[in-house]
A protein has these predicted regions:
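C-terminal domain-boundary segment and adjacent tail
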Residues: 130, 225-266
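Active-site beta->alpha N-cap acidic-glycine motif
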Residues: 1-39
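Active-site rim beta-loop-alpha module in soluble metabolic enzymes
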Residues: 163-195
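Structural preference for beta-strand elements that scaffold enzyme active sites
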Residues: 2-5, 25-31, 95-99, 129-131, ...
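Substrate-binding cleft of extracellular glycoside hydrolase catalytic domains
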Residues: 25-27, 31-82
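Acidic (Asp/Glu)-rich catalytic clusters
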Residues: 13-27, 42-56, 89-92, 162-170, ...
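Active-site beta-loop-alpha junctions enriched in small/polar residues
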Residues: 7-9, 31-37, 103, 135-138, ...
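Catalytic domains of cell-wall/extracellular-matrix polysaccharide-remodeling enzymes
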Residues: 74, 80-167, 187-190, 202
Length: 266
């Protein structure tokens, strides 16, 4: 793991910021959060006013990205982005980059790309990279973790413009985004998952590819949040195994973090 991000609305954000402050060698950024997807573990916006469009009927953030795209007022989105970044900075974080929880600000559910342009604009204000792929390959379009709802023609018609805009405001971003999926036999056993990841990494194209995981230790708290807790435990096990690093090295993959990316894209 070379980079990570922190969710400002969540209760353990302060501890994570203190870790980042004590370990500046790690590239840790802000995971812009506009969805609250778990049934019983939920959170609300950081902002204390003008957040009505960002909340569901219970006052929490919307559970799904499509709800954000359909309901969010763009001025309230902008204010909440600033609030989350500034909250984590106040808690001790010097952010290395921005990314977005569940892709709720990408516009890929309904084609509301004004949200993505807003994020890029604010990332430029802070001088931070943002996780958004420079192009969309067929593998990305069909990736169930990315869960893109609009057609490739529509997204490709705008991605060039959005990336040109990102570069114009000084925002670095990876070339590709390709996370592992859980829709096949890799969900059945740890060995299957390991073999799947090892094969997936052989398919990475030339350039900067970001893949992401959600590693966690097995505990009652994790099991209380999600029924798919085993996936996160397997991710922790696999990516703490020295053999995985050896496999990555054998493929000629060079690991970088978001600070490296920012320097590369200057």
């Amino acid at each position: 793991i070379t980079s990570s991000t922190i969710m400002a609305p969540c209760p353990w954000a302060y501890e994570a910021c203190q870790f980042a402050k004590k370990n500046p060698q790690f590239a840790i950024g802000v995971h812009l959060t506009f969805t609250s997807e778990w049934a019983t573990y939920r959170w609300s916006p950081v902002g204390t006013s003008n957040t009505d469009s960002l909340r569901d009927e219970l006052g929490f953030m919307h559970p799904e990205s499509i709800d954000v795209e359909k309901n969010a007022d763009i001025k309230e989105v902008a204010a909440e982005i600033h609030a989350q970044i500034n909250r984590l900075k106040a808690l001790g974080l010097t952010p290395s980059h921005l990314d977005n929880h569940m892709g709720s600000l990408y516009g890929i559910e309904t084609g509301r790309f004004e949200l993505l342009q807003l994020v890029l604009s604010i990332a430029g204000e802070y001088g931070l990279p943002f996780r958004f792929p420079g192009t969309f390959t067929d593998a990305q379009m069909s990736n169930t973790m990315l869960d893109i709802k609009i057609d490739k023609e529509q997204i490709m018609g705008l991605v060039g413009q959005l990336n040109a805009y990102a570069h114009s405001v000084g925002v670095a971003n990876p070339d590709f985004l390709l996370p592992g999926e859980w829709t096949g036999p890799q969900n059945d056993s740890y060995d299957n998952y390991r073999d799947y990841i090892y094969e997936l990494y052989k398919t990475f194209p030339e350039g900067v590819t970001e893949t992401y995981i959600h590693p966690a230790l097995e505990c009652d708290e994790l099991k209380g949040i999600t029924n798919s807790w085993h996936r996160r435990v397997w991710e922790y096990k696999l990516f703490s195994d020295p053999k995985t690093k050896q496999h990555i090295d054998s493929l000629g993959i060079k690991l970088i973090n978001y600070r490296d990316l920012a320097e590369m894209k200057k």
